[in-house]
Amino acid sequence: MSITAAQVNELRKITGAGLMDCKKALTETNGDLEQAVDYLRKKGLAAASKKAGRAATEGAVGSYIHAGGKIGVLVEVNCETDFVARNDNFQAFVKDIAMHIAAASPQYVRREEVPAELLEREKEIYRAKARETGKPENIIEKIIEGQINKFYAEICLMEQNFVKDPDKTVQQFLNETISSIGENMSVRRFARFVLGEGLEKKESDFAAEVAAAAGL
């Protein structure tokens, strides 16, 4: 069935969950609002949203160095209190995120950070390809929307499939951790370094090496 914007907005008001999460929840539950709320709660998304407005100014800068020193990552993850910043679960989360960044090579933390000019360029490429199919404009726009969401999932950390559990996104992993720890958390920024990046060298699959080192 078709999910309307009004349904999505209503679910967002109730749960405070993200737009795409609400849309997916309604799709999975055939538009049943009550079931969609339960769906989000089971995923940890609704519970996390209740904490989202609280300031997260403590935290830690974590690091990950790939075996052999070929890839290095620094990532800043914020939480509300210094007590939680020293918590083993929080520290494990920071380490897992740093390892994920090393393996998946995201370019941005979230979709809002993607430059408008880059996004528009991608849309034009997708639009040109879609028009070659001869489909109506309304169908073409839906195709473009789907392609852009895939693009976000490739380059935005929070929308990537988590390398240690590909059945969930990094955002879902974050939400689950927020629910278990009981404090708001946020991945603020990261930097990823590759040995010899920009220099002419023999190609190798660093992502596969990182995954292998993590036992994935």
Swiss-Prot record:
> What's one GO MF term for it?
translation elongation factor activity
User: What broad class describes the main subcellular location of this protein?
Assistant: cytoplasm
Q: What does this protein do?
A: Associates with the EF-Tu.GDP complex and induces the exchange of GDP to GTP. It remains bound to the aminoacyl-tRNA.EF-Tu.GTP complex up to the GTP hydrolysis stage on the ribosome.
Q: Which UniProt keywords apply?
A: Cytoplasm, Elongation factor, Protein biosynthesis
Protein name (Swiss-Prot/TrEMBL): Elongation factor Ts
Which residue ranges traverse the bilayer? none
Q: Which NCBIfam families match?
A: tsf
Which gene is transcribed and translated to give this protein? tsf
